């Protein structure tokens, strides 16, 4: 029941260009990335990153790295022109357990929003959910000061689930049943005032308006869109970031 349209592109990604009379090239690491499609019986049950503004909800981190927060190959490491010593990895049994957890949560309609933790780590995952839902977010990290960067920017496998407060216990019980009891933690709640606040027990890291952060996040894409697409349309889309309506 699964269709795989392509799987070879990631095995041969290479780009070549001329710079100052010399040929330059970048060849991507050889790693198989497969895209797949499956039938969807009811599009109304599809999980998206669009955060609900309901304050009687919680955001739960399902951390398949189980707190290791390895930074190798992360965007943050590359920003500092490093690769890191230890890269994230996964345990096969945990992937199966994660699938079972999410499937049961979805079947029971416990999940309001879902986003995988990927490029940029946990902080970017949370911000993208807030941006999509046009709402604020209160993030509380239970880590020491020397662990903050790793917790926010590690790209360990995992996901963030938004669930109604009344179903948090259900998710935790299900996680324990599939062997992920120590991998699920409550990480954040929505804010109605549109502010993004990130705290640790020791100090406040971020306190900013959602739209201010989203304008920074979208700045590069906006600049590209003005060149590639219709500039007026790109400007209109960029200006709409300040609006509170998340759209369809």
Residue ranges of predicted features:
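Short hydrophobic/aromatic beta-strand micro-patches
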Residues: 160-164
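Intein/HINT protein-splicing elements and their conserved insertion hotspots or analogous self-processing inserts
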Residues: 3-153, 165-248
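Short, solvent-exposed beta-strand edge segments and adjacent coil->beta transition regions
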Residues: 156-158
């Amino acid at each position: 029941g699964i269709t795989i349209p392509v799987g070879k592109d990631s095995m041969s990604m290479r780009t070549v260009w001329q710079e100052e009379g010399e040929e330059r090239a970048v060849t991507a690491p050889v790693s198989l990335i497969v895209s797949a499609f499956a039938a969807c019986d009811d599009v109304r049950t599809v999980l998206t990153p669009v955060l609900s503004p309901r304050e009687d909800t919680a955001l739960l981190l399902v951390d398949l790295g189980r707190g290791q927060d390895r930074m190798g190959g992360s965007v943050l490491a590359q920003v500092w022109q490093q690769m890191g010593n230890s890269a994230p990895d996964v345990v096969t049994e945990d992937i199966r357990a994660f699938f079972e957890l999410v499937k049961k949560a979805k079947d029971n309609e416990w999940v309001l929003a879902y986003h995988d933790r990927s490029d940029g780590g946990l902080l970017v995952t949370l911000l993208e959910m807030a941006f999509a839902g046009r709402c604020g977010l209160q993030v509380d990290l239970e880590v020491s000061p020397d662990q903050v960067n790793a917790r926010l920017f590690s790209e360990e496998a995992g996901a963030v689930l938004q669930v109604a407060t009344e179903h948090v216990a259900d998710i935790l019980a299900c996680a324990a049943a599939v062997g992920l009891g120590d991998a699920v933690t409550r990480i954040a709640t929505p804010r109605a005032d549109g502010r993004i606040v990130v705290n640790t027990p020791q100090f406040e890291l971020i306190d900013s308006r959602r739209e201010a952060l989203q304008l920074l996040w979208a700045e590069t894409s906006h600049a590209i869109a003005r060149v590639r697409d219709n500039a007026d349309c790109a400007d209109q889309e960029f200006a709409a970031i300040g609006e509170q309506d998340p759209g369809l």
